[in-house]
């Protein structure tokens, strides 16, 4: 199952830092790119079936550390 989420940050530099950090996450079929603008980052990955997948929790925690949040 595929999951996608978009985050928004107060500045382009925070979004860029998030994007570059997430690129190195260990997640199946991970795709990370800028979203609607340079303050938005879109993340898409395949949810691991049959086991607990903490990817979304890790994304949320990292976004929070960089003053970002899930985009509405």
Tell me what each language-model feature is.
Residues 1-72:
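Acidic/polar low-complexity segments and flexible, solvent-exposed patches
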